[in-house]
């Protein structure tokens, strides 16, 4: 084939150079636009989830958490309050790693865990909570909120009772160990008809209540009244006593009926055994403290609690409302305040 070569004209060279330049500028602009868009994307917060349940970021914006303060009862209250308020306000809830370490070995909790390294990079808005529900808590502003305080009131979460009970379901091995112990108990050689968990809070409260809060802890008389209340209403009850002051309990709880068992180990650093025993009973006798409150809440049944255990001018009543701590259907037995009046 004959190929005729035409001379390359100067105007054609200009045209091709123009097309190449325009194309290059266009692609550079497109690339810069993509890079800028990537810079403007929000930082993705890595979390370690303790469950397979995903909180879709397209559905819930921001991140709410709560300070992990206190021992088991306090942290259960903090967890339940965070769970309820986050749901109420349409925000995703994440728990601190410390709280996960306290609760996860005992319960089947589902809230995802926030790494401490990630938490330290977030511009948190601290939000203090009273120990009772307030109307303003239904409309809390802010996407990155960290609750503070010691909330442990049914007024926050009782409308979600079944969900809270599900969150605080015992792991199988924890529950089975407690049930195995209870199955082996007898009352005067017979199988008990009713199991009543008894939690006696002693420890630091013995000194803190009278010296700081103008209050008292449960005494021998209160416990006798509480046990007799159940003896009058149930056939062959057995009382399963747990305490962080078991020596005091052995000296002050009447065992002449043959229906009292001193159980648990009273070790505050590893409370799973005591707590599981209490919740596997049918009813509860508590004294003071969030440990007993939660045991009663999870157990259901009848609950006897120590009522009016501070003087009317106690500073404790500024941060604690009995009506927000004890369910209305629970039965209170008034404390003996005479030791405080002697001083």
Curated annotation (Swiss-Prot):
Entry keywords, A to Z: Glycoprotein, Glycosyltransferase, Golgi apparatus, Lipid metabolism, Membrane, Signal-anchor, Transferase, Transmembrane, Transmembrane helix
Which segments sit on the Cytoplasmic face? 1-14
This protein's GO CC annotations: Golgi cisterna membrane
Keyword Manganese recorded = no
One GO MF term on file is: galactoside 2-alpha-L-fucosyltransferase activity
Its annotated pathway? Answer: Protein modification; protein glycosylation
Q: Show the InterPro entries listed in the entry.
A: Glyco_trans_11
Pfam families per the UniProt record, alphabetical = Glyco_transf_11 (PF01531)
Q: What is this protein called?
A: Galactoside alpha-(1,2)-fucosyltransferase 2
Catalytic reactions of this protein: a beta-D-galactosyl-(1->3)-N-acetyl-beta-D-glucosaminyl derivative + GDP-beta-L-fucose = an alpha-L-Fuc-(1->2)-beta-D-Gal-(1->3)-beta-D-GlcNAc derivative + GDP + H(+); a beta-D-galactosyl-(1->4)-N-acetyl-beta-D-glucosaminyl derivative + GDP-beta-L-fucose = an alpha-L-Fuc-(1->2)-beta-D-Gal-(1->4)-beta-D-GlcNAc derivative + GDP + H(+); a neolactoside nLc4Cer + GDP-beta-L-fucose = a neolactoside IV(2)-alpha-Fuc-nLc4Cer + GDP + H(+); a neolactoside nLc4Cer(d18:1(4E)) + GDP-beta-L-fucose = a neolactoside IV(2)-alpha-Fuc-nLc4Cer(d18:1(4E)) + GDP + H(+)
Topology check: give the Lumenal ranges: 29-343
Which family is this sequence assigned to? Belongs to the glycosyltransferase 11 family.
- According to its UniProt entry, what is the function of this protein? Catalyzes the transfer of L-fucose, from a guanosine diphosphate-beta-L-fucose, to the terminal galactose on both O- and N-linked glycans chains of cell surface glycoproteins and glycolipids and the resulting epitope regulates several processes such as cell-cell interaction including host-microbe interaction, cell surface expression and cell proliferation. Preferentially fucosylates gangliosides GA1 and GM1 in the antrum, cecum and colon and in the female reproductive organs.
Primary place of residence? Golgi
| Membrane spanning stretches | 15-28
EC number(s) stated in the UniProt entry for this protein: 2.4.1.69, 2.4.1.344
Upper taxonomic classification of the species?
A: Eukaryota, Metazoa, Chordata, Craniata, Vertebrata
Positions annotated with a glycan in the UniProt record: 188, 282, 308
């Amino acid at each position: 084939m004959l190929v005729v070569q035409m001379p390359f004209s100067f105007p054609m060279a200009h045209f091709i150079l123009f097309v190449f330049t325009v194309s290059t500028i266009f692609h550079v602009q497109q690339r810069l636009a993509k890079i800028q868009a990537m810079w403007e994307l929000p930082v993705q917060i890595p979390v370690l989830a303790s469950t397979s349940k995903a909180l879709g970021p397209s559905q819930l914006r921001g991140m709410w958490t709560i300070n992990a303060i206190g021992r088991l009862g306090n942290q259960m209250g903090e967890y339940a309050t965070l769970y309820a308020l986050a749901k109420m306000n349409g925000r995703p809830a994440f728990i601190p790693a410390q709280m996960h370490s306290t609760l996860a070995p005992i319960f089947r909790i589902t809230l995802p865990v926030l790494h401490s390294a990630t938490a330290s990079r977030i511009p948190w808005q601290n939000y203090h909570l009273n120990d009772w529900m307030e109307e303003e808590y239904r409309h809390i502003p802010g996407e990155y909120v960290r609750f503070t305080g010691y909330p442990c009131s049914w007024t926050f979460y009782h409308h979600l009772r079944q969900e809270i009970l599900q969150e605080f379901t015992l792991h199988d091995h924890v529950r089975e160990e407690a049930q195995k112990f209870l199955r082996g108990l007898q009352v005067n050689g017979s199988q008990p008809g009713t199991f009543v968990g008894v939690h006696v809070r002693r420890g630091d409260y013995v000194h803190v209540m009278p010296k700081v809060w103008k209050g008292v802890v449960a005494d021998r008389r209160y416990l006798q009244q509480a046990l007799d209340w159940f003896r009058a209403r149930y056939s062959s009850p057995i009382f399963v006593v747990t305490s962080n002051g078991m020596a005091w309990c052995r000296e002050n709880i009447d065992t002449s009926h043959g229906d009292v068992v001193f159980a648990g180990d009273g070790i505050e650093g590893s409370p799973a055994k005591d707590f599981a025993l209490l919740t596997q009973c049918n009813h509860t006798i508590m004294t003071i403290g969030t440990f007993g409150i939660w045991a009663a809440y999870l157990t259901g049944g009848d609950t006897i609690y120590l009522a009016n255990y501070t003087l009317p001018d106690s500073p404790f009543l500024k941060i604690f409302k009995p009506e927000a701590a004890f369910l209305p259907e629970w039965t209170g037995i008034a404390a003996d305040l005479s030791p405080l009046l002697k001083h």
